[in-house]
Structures are given as C-alpha cells and as structure tokens.
UniProtKB/Swiss-Prot annotation:
A motif (Antp-type hexapeptide) lies at residues 94-99. It comes from Papio anubis (Olive baboon). PROSITE patterns: ANTENNAPEDIA, HOMEOBOX_1, HOMEOBOX_2. It is found in: Nucleus. Its main location: nucleus. This is Homeobox protein Hox-A2. One of its GO terms (molecular function) is DNA-binding transcription repressor activity, RNA polymerase II-specific.
C-alpha cells in the first residue's frame, strides 16, 4: 500500500507543484475546474489525463486516513470534511430548488405551465391577475392535459353575436370583448378559432348534402324518364299489335264474307239465269214488237261502243265493271235468246211483226263475237 501511495505521490509530484494542487483542492468543483485548466495548459503528457488521476483521492474517502498514517501533511481531510461532496456523489442533499425539480419531474408538467410557475415564483403572485393564476393552477394540478374552459351562457351568447357579425376579430376588439366578458384575450382567440372551424364543417356538410340531394334528384328524374319511355314503348307495342290484330281480324272477316258471298252469288246467278233471260227476252221481244225498225241501229251502236271499248288501251277499259256489264250477254243467254228467237218464234208468240231469220242470225253472231273478244282479253 505504501508503494502504491508513494507511486501516486511521485506521480503528483511530477506535476508543477503539489501546493498548487492542494490549495485548489478543498471545493470539489473548483478543484476539478482549476486542475483541468492547469493540466490542460501546463501538462505535456497526453497519454493519461491528469485531472482524473488528481481527483481520485478526493473521490475515495477511504484513502484519507491512510494518508494520515503515512505521516504526510493532511490538508485534504479538512477539505473533505467541509465539503458535502463525498456524500453528494451518491446521495446529494435535497435543497428546496431540488425538491421543486423533483416534483416537476414527478408531475410531468408541460413546459408552458412550468414556465408560468417559474415566472409566478420569480415575480410573485401580485403581478398576475386572478384569471391567469387560475389558469396556472389548473394547468399545474390537472396533469399533462389542460382542462377545458367552462364558458357561461352569457359569455357564449355574446361571443356568438360577435361571430355572427365578424368571423375574424382585430386585436383591439378582441381585448374589448375579453374585458367585457371577464375572459383572457387568448381564450377569446381560441374560441373564435374553434368556432370558425365548426362553421366550416357545417357549411361543408350542407354543401355535401345539397350535392347528394341534387344527384339523387337527377337520378330519380332519369329513372322516371326511363320508366316513362319504357311505358310509352310498351303502349306503342301494344297499340301496334292491337292494330295488327284488328287488321288481321278485319281481313279474315272480309275473306270469310267474300268466300261466303262468292258461292251465294254464283248460286244466285245460276238460279237467276233461267229467269233473267226470260225477262230480257220478253223485254227484247217487246222492244222488237214496238220498235222493230230500230233494232239494227241499236245493234250498230252497241257494236261501235264495244269496238271503242276494245280498241281503247286505257286500263279503265279493261276493268271488271265493264266485264260485268257484258255478263248479261253471256253465251248461254245468247244461245237461249237464239233458241227462243227461232223461225217458229213469230208463230208461237203470235206477233204481228214479221222479223226475218237473217236479222236474228246476225244479232246472235255479233253477240257471240263480242263475248269471245272479252274472254280473250
């Protein structure tokens, strides 16, 4: 142990002077700073930092009695007795300002509240107003989160009135409102900021609802239009199908009626043929009896008219009514008429007019040629 102590003493003596180190030793902070400065300026060895080696005796209190046992002068124990560093290295004494710091660390105050508390402690409570002291108390006692400001109904009413007229406040007006409502300027400013954000959200929600309502109305109108178009198309299809059905039914009825009328008409014609030639023959005979000299003229006119009708190339000349007009002079009727108008006809009917057989032969020949020409066309 003496060897180690002598080595340490020799190391210390290698420094400029032991007295300078010992005189600067009693306060720990001063010894550390002065020795570090001196060693940094005067020492030339850079291998081992001398300040660390110099502070070893002061940091180890067990070495001080050993220094006394060695018979060396002991100014360091007196310095160690006067300074609280040996106990403070591990457990420093608690001063009031240290207690405040520990309390601040335990409660984890926000920096704004800590600064306000420090300012309150420095300047005193007389410099702060009642409202600010309440805010500081709320912030310091409430933990990490600041409590919300409780506004009264009158304050809210006045703030809402002011916001209705002015969304943004100038500083003089803000100070005036804060003084009237017993609030701080910061509280008024924050309230107006929050109210502007609320107003913005409300307007955006209204715009979104209006746009959604417009979109829904447009979609509903489009759906209604589509439904109306579908209805109109369906009605048109029904009307067209009904018209087609009516037309088909009408044509079917017409065809049925024509089919019914065709055989009935044919039967009527066939039944009336035996009678109609008689009536026509009787009429012809009467005409022949009363107007016998005009028969060649009538025949000539009939022949001319028929020739004109045959020579005409217009479609009206070939229509069905013209053929129906000549159906009266059919081959059967002509044959019947030729049979009736026989050489024995004057004797059977006892007519006083004498008609030659040549004239009747000419009449029958002309009628047959006319009918044959119509049949050919």
């Amino acid at each position: 142990m003496n060897y180690e102590f002598e080595r340490e003493i020799g190391f210390i003596n290698s420094q400029p002077s032991l007295a300078e180190c010992l005189t600067s030793f009693p306060p720990v902070a001063d010894t550390f700073q002065s020795s570090s400065i001196k060693t940094s300026t005067l020492s030339h060895s850079t291998l081992i930092p001398p300040p660390f080696e110099q502070t070893i005796p002061s940091l180890n209190p067990s070495n001080h009695p050993r220094h006394g046992a060695g018979g060396r002068p002991k100014p360091s124990p007196a310095g160690s007795r006067g300074s609280p560093v040996p106990a403070g290295a591990l457990q420093p004494p608690e001063y009031p300002w240290m207690k405040e710091k520990k309390a601040a660390k335990k409660t984890a105050l926000p920096p704004a509240a800590a600064a306000a508390a420090a300012a309150a402690a420095a300047t005193g409570p007389a410099c702060l107003s009642h409202k600010e002291s309440l805010e500081i108390a709320d912030g310091s006692g409430g933990g990490s989160r600041r409590l919300r400001t409780a506004y009264t109904n009158t304050q809210l009413l006045e703030l809402e009135k002011e916001f209705h007229f002015n969304k943004y406040l100038c500083r003089p007006r803000r100070v005036e409102i804060a003084a009237l409502l017993d609030l701080t300027e910061r509280q008024v400013k924050v309230w107006f900021q929050n109210r502007r954000m609320k107003h913005k959200r409300q307007t955006q929600c209204k715009e979104n609802q209006n746009s959604e309502g417009k979109c829904k109305s447009l979609e509903d109108s489009e759906k209604v239009e589509e439904e109306e178009e579908e209805k109109t198309l369906f009605e048109q299809a029904l009307s067209v199908s009904g018209a087609l059905l009516e037309r088909e039914g009408y044509t079917f009825q017409q065809n049925a009626l024509s089919q019914q009328q065709a055989p009935s008409g044919h039967n009527g014609d066939s039944q009336s043929f035996p009678v109609s030639p008689l009536t026509s023959n009787e009429k012809n005979l009467k005409h022949f009896q009363h107007q016998s000299p005009t028969v060649p003229n009538c025949l000539s006119t009939m022949g001319q008219n028929c020739g004109a009708g045959l020579n005409n190339d217009s479609p009206e000349a070939l229509e069905v009514p013209s053929l129906q007009d000549f159906n009266v002079f059919s081959t059967d009727s002509c044959l019947q008429l030729s049979d009736t108008v026989s050489p024995s006809l004057p004797g059977s009917l006892d007519s006083p007019v004498d008609i030659s057989a040549d004239s009747f032969d000419f009449f029958t020949d002309t009628l047959t040629t006319i009918d044959l020409q119509h049949l050919n066309y």
